[in-house]
Structures are given as C-alpha cells and as structure tokens.
Amino acid sequence: MGISQSQIKDLIGDKENIVIFEVGCADGRDSKTFLNTFGDNLKLYTFDPEPVNARLVTTLGSEDAFGGSNDQLITDERHKFTHCALCDYTGTIVFNRSRTVDGPGNGYEWGRYSGSIRRPVTYTESPKYGKRWPQSVFEETVEVDCTTIDDFCKKNNIDHIDFLWMDTQGAEREVLTGAKKMLKNISFIYTEYYDEEMYENCAGLSEIKEILSEFELTNDWRYGDADGGDALFKKIVP
C-alpha cells in the first residue's frame, strides 16, 4: 500500500473522535501501526474473512507473519475486529482461500493474503505477465459471514468514517456498493484496484471513480508487477 499511517493521521487532522475502517486487515500488522500512530481518540474497526487471520488477531499469544506479538489487538479497547467479508449484502458468501505450496500450516500460514470473494483469474496466470506467483494457489473455498458497511454502521451507531482503508482483492465494487448510505459521511477512501482481471469481473479504477463520483482522486500509486495500484480518494466538500 502506498500511504503510511502517519500520513493518514496528517490527512485527518485534529479531531475529538477518529473512526477508521480497515477492510482486509490480514494478520494485523497495519492494524497495530494504526493503534500506535493514533491516540486515545481513535476507534479502529477491522474486518477479515480468512479463518487463519481471524484466529491470529483474536487469540492471545499469536504473532503476525514477522513474529510480532498480536496481543495488543485483543487488549486495546480502541480496536474492534469482526470476522466477516464486507460486500453488498448481509448474510453468507463463498470465500476463495489462498495458500502457499509447501508452506507451514498447510500453506495458509504464509499464503493467506490473496483470498477473495471473487475467483482468481489473471492472478494465477496472466497473458501479459505469465505465472507471477506460482507458489500461490487457490484450492479451497469456505463459507463466511458477510455484511455491508451500511448495515454494520447502523448496528454499531457509527455516523461517520474518517478513513476507509480497503485491501479486498478484487471485491472493491461490492464493498463500496454496500456503503451507499455511508459514502456521504466518509472523508477519505484508500483502496487497491486492478485494471486487469486479477479476480473475476473485478472493478477497475474507472469504475471505482464512477462509484465515488462525489470524491476526488488525489493519488494513484501504480504497481510494478500488475496492471493496477493503490488509489486515494478525498470527499469533495461543496
């Protein structure tokens, strides 16, 4: 991702209460950086559908991929994790798990970062790039809970999101569509995107810009190994 938590803090500025959504928090490394960058006025909501990630961010004694303790994610009252996928409806959805061939934990300890509610397409083999990540495979699906940002915010009495961070592996359309009511109350949105079909029928940057018609694209960090990047959008204030 192309932006740091300290830069996000500068963007948000001084506020009495700060709400950040991290959609696709993986093993919690970025989540811990958010907690250590912001003060007591932060409320951090994180989401991830991958079962291994959910275990690692909710179990005392667990570690992230680099051996850092995850205990802060459990003990810090500013953090709330929800084991689910965010999409455009509330219920259940099929999640395509990723793993690394010959990795520990049947490969899920290393390769769990590319799973998606969408089926991988050019991720596994691209006409342009070939097999970029041959050790990464998608061989298992699991049914997981899902909800929308709108439903989650209504249930948890959240009326504003200062920063929406999305690392959703091709599910950008679904996440943003599920936030139709809340979009007017979100200050910044930071999302990855793909202009190749990395995942089946995933939204490219042009479609994301159409969905976020009331936002300005302020930054676009392009990837070197894929047709895509990370984009930062700022709410247009009349």
Residue positions per predicted region:
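Phosphate/nucleotide-binding beta-alpha loop and adjacent structural elements of enzyme active sites
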Residues: 1-238
